[in-house]
Amino acid sequence: MQFFGRLVNTLSSVTNLFSNPFRVKEVSLTDYVSSERVREEGQLILLQNVSNRTWDCVLVSPRNPQSGFRLFQLESEADALVNFQQFSSQLPPFYESSVQVLHVEVLQHLTDLIRNHPSWTVTHLAVELGIRECFHHSRIISCANSTENEEGCTPLHLACRKGDSEILVELVQYCHAQMDVTDNKGETAFHYAVQGDNPQVLQLLGKNASAGLNQVNNQGLTPLHLACKMGKQEMVRVLLLCNARCNIMGPGGFPIHTAMKFSQKGCAEMIISMDSNQIHSKDPRYGASPLHWAKNAEMARMLLKRGCDVDSTSSSGNTALHVAVMRNRFDCVMVLLTYGANAGARGEHGNTPLHLAMSKDNMEMVKALIVFGAEVDTPNDFGETPALIASKISKLITRKALLTLLKTVGADHHFPIIQGVSTEQGSAAATHPLFSLDRTQPPAISLNNLELQDLMPISRARKPAFILSSMRDEKRSHDHLLCLDGGGVKGLVIIQLLIAIEKASGVATKDLFDWVAGTSTGGILALAILHSKSMAYMRGVYFRMKDEVFRGSRPYESGPLEEFLKREFGEHTKMTDVKKPKVMLTGTLSDRQPAELHLFRNYDAPEAVREPRCNQNINLKPPTQPADQLVWRAARSSGAAPTYFRPNGRFLDGGLLANNPTLDAMTEIHEYNQDMIRKGQGNKVKKLSIVVSLGTGKSPQVPVTCVDVFRPSNPWELAKTVFGAKELGKMVVDCCTDPDGRAVDRARAWCEMVGIQYFRLNPQLGSDIMLDEVSDAVLVNALWETEVYIYEHREEFQKLVQLLLSP
């Protein structure tokens, strides 16, 4: 059926072609000997064909008077006279200036143009026809700047829209076409060129100075605005090279704002590269920076990488984070937070981003804001806290879920005395057990605890109850050890724990500990502590780094990871450049069997007094000395996880032998102190008093059905063997790299035996998170579970901080 349908359509098209009265046909004048000449203008003759009862218009060939072209054959005399008058007025400049016109196809195109655009001048027609010789005709030159048509456009406008650079040159050089003439929409030739597909046309226009380059149309858009709106990156580049101005205000701001509004990354980058100040420009309507206009993570990231102020405010006082939350753009929110946006910034009416997020029914966004430091008890100008906003949500399920979310981190509900809230309500709420300020026994977290009266009052969420104001004595009599597990991107959990410790103590991690040991991701964080990088900064770095490093499939390219490490620690920085606190990173020497644990230190290694583990009957290259060891290489060696990254020379990930480096660090400290005593420097030795071990989160325990590997005798047993081998392999890897279990028990027992305070902080995660996880939502949820863990173990944190701050 489709075949017959196409056949019918084809036959219909052919029939119309031959029945078209305006079909141009080459004829001989001898065929019209018996016809009457009705009119004659130049080479055009209108003939009445008596036998056919038609009126034919014939263009006599200037080269051969006996031949010509029939332009139409009409049955109506009136129509024939009208069309003859039109043709006789428009055709002469063409057949007088170029022999190319005297072809059936060209004449057909030209006559169709004349009929379809009766208001066009001969110059407009010449542009569409595209024959250069025609532009030397005096009549065509005389109409070069004519705007007498329905659009009010000049022939130059048409040439630019068509993208015909050769015709453009003819118009400008021979016809002296003006480039600043506007059409009915206020658009110049530059606007038309932008809408075309040939950047060369725009480049030719820009060679001559013209006001049209920066002319605004009736919508207030310059050609640069229009190019940004349409995403014509190459057009933007040419306009900027032609010195188009970036600081002309349009209805939505500068061209950079237009590029951001329509998410045209390439256009925005072009503008910023030409004028870096545009990144800070404010639009006239909202007083918003380009970052406020970012609609996706890619656009926001591009601006922030180029130095855009992440906390710039609009006329209403809102930051870009406020706008991203209001528009429910979670990806933008995450980019802004990871680049250091203030999660507690007060905007219009005193609302923080968390106030706005409560009405969006987006749990991930609420979690992200709180995880990145948003205070849940901050009232706005109306005295409303985020929890009160949540309690006003009309959807009961959403309302309960949000309030339960707050309760998991210690939210208490009560009525503060503020204007507009009755004291009777306040006192009634204060007597409710859920609103009690006594936090010694918080109620169990369950939706069943949320009664109707719990949903109405103004809520005040948790305060860090264990914050201490005392500062530690710089001359401590004992040493403190911090140990950081390996775990890939789950190092974010360690960061969140360290942020809580810093917030509670008011002291940077670097000043709380004398020794820091780390494996893999823990090693990177140990170096970050050594080089005085804040944990809030590192949290953002980790979120940004994962998208750079974990691209493609495993094993990942090492280049992005190495570039990241060089960028953060310096390409030529040595381990011994910073000496306090003492830092050790674990690595696995894989150029020998059995493999050996190696420690990258920022101090000289203690001299060994014990016999070597193996007989050194082979020639092995000694490790690099700390003074010569590059920091970024040490971090790369410690984090060379097999199947994730290729080995760094002879080094594999330290997690193969010490994913929890606590016992190895304590052994190292003991050997270091013994070496100091042997060297007569026993007065410099300090006893270890506190060991803090931070994990990257415990994965949930799951049942394993089969780890049996045997010789199969049938297909069913073969499948069981394959499955068992897979599970067994996973179990072997997990056992080798397990940082919890007996490793923690042994460390705790050792510390208790020698009188050392031991703290193991490692939250239970709800799901198994891979080392190369890139989902923001998954990682934010892991940090949320860490926040819940911190609140539930607040007494342990309080005790730890008190001990760390004691002399």
From Swiss-Prot:
Enzyme class: hydrolase
Substrates-to-products reaction catalysed: a 1,2-diacyl-sn-glycero-3-phosphocholine + H2O = a 1-acyl-sn-glycero-3-phosphocholine + a fatty acid + H(+); a 1-O-alkyl-2-acyl-sn-glycero-3-phosphocholine + H2O = a 1-O-alkyl-sn-glycero-3-phosphocholine + a fatty acid + H(+); 1,2-dihexadecanoyl-sn-glycero-3-phosphocholine + H2O = 1-hexadecanoyl-sn-glycero-3-phosphocholine + hexadecanoate + H(+); 1-hexadecanoyl-2-(9Z-octadecenoyl)-sn-glycero-3-phosphocholine + H2O = 1-hexadecanoyl-sn-glycero-3-phosphocholine + (9Z)-octadecenoate + H(+)
Keyword Ligase tagged: no
Motif stretch (GXSXG): 518-522
Modified residues (Phosphoserine): 13
Tissue: Expressed in neurons of central and peripheral nervous system. Highly expressed in Purkinje cells in cerebellum and dorsal and ventral horn neurons in the spinal cord. Expressed in testis (at protein level). Expressed in skeletal muscle (at protein level).
Chain location of the short sequence motif DGA/G per the record: 653-655
Chain intervals for the UniProt region annotation (Calmodulin-binding (1-9-14 motif)): 678-687
Top-rank taxon: Eukaryota
Domain notes: Has two putative calmodulin binding domains, the 1-9-14 and IQ motifs. One calmodulin molecule interacts with PLA2G6 dimer, likely through 1-9-14 motif on each monomer. Binds calmodulin in a calcium-dependent way.
Assembly and interaction partners: Homodimer formed by catalytic domains tightly interacting through a large hydrophobic interface. The contact area involves 3 alpha helices, several loops and a part of the beta sheet from each monomer. Both active sites of the dimer are in close proximity adopting an open conformation that provide sufficient space for phospholipid access and favoring cooperativity in deacylation-reacylation reactions. Each monomer has 9 ankyrin repeats stacked side-by-side in an elongated structure oriented outwards from the catalytic core.
Protein task: Calcium-independent phospholipase involved in phospholipid remodeling with implications in cellular membrane homeostasis, mitochondrial integrity and signal transduction. Hydrolyzes the ester bond of the fatty acyl group attached at sn-1 or sn-2 position of phospholipids (phospholipase A1 and A2 activity respectively), producing lysophospholipids that are used in deacylation-reacylation cycles.
Name recorded for this polypeptide: 85/88 kDa calcium-independent phospholipase A2
Species for this entry: Mus musculus (Mouse)
